Amino acid sequence: MVARSKEGKAAKIHTLCMDGEHPEDIKLRFESGRMRVQQRKEKSAHSLYRSVPSPDEVDTIHRLFLESKSLKAQKDAILSGRVESIDALGRSKFKWMKNTIYKNVLLMHPQERNIHGNIFGGYLMKTAMELSWVTAMCFVGKHFPVFLSADKIEFMNPVSIGAIMEFTGRVVYSYSDKFVIQVLAYHIDRETNEKTATNKLTYIYQASSSPEFGSANDLDLCVNAVEVADIVPKEYEEFVAYIEGRRALADYKQSRSSNV
């Protein structure tokens, strides 16, 4: 979390006191938090909006580009975005990224304001989370989505009372039984219809054939995991989102493995 002043600048907070019954445990948790902050800064510095993809990611983008061109040449049923069998490409099923999009447009009311008179960030997070869940349910169809992690939450611009907000959720990456959903929040200018991004949130889910859950200490929280459709991007912006999703899932697996 961060503390902000009403001008949107960093606000000074109290220094954390690490005295207590178990000081070593407290210091260990503090150091873990410090390392997470440092890792977050490093990830931000290597964002795809600030630096070029790695050589491996460039190869992935090119491979996906060639596959998407081949898919475009298939019959109309494939172009419609429905799950289809593509044996020649080695994909049992796929979905175009653009066909996983779901949206929600809301008017921001004063009861959701914070102490600075803007919309409370927790309300925006709640709205985005609900949309990600709907997106996940529609993506897995007859199966059950299992929430695993909120990977990254970005606040780019404050949201004022009375603002018209558009929330857009989509599946940006999938691998085996896991998939990544990205929710973008935009402020819509009612006079110009221009959209300004205010929030970006990333969620990781798993698909299950039943609503049963495993242990919270396991990497997989569901006991009857099922594979989901491969996500195929078309436009360059979708390729960037795909790589972001792949990074998010890799980070999740690494963090869970180190904690087990």
Question: Which residues does each PLM region occupy?
Answer:
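Hydrophobic beta-strand-centered segment that forms part of the acyl-chain substrate-binding groove
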Residues: 123, 130-182, 186, 196-200
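HotDog/MaoC-like acyl-thioester-processing domains
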Residues: 1-56, 161, 172-260
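Extended repeat-based solenoid scaffolds, especially LRR ectodomains
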Residues: 41-98
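Generic structural detector for well-ordered beta-strands
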Residues: 105-107, 154, 204-206
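A conserved, well-ordered hydrophobic junction motif at loop->secondary-structure transitions
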Residues: 94-134, 140-147
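A compositionally biased, intrinsically disordered/low-complexity signal enriched
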Residues: 2, 61, 107-108
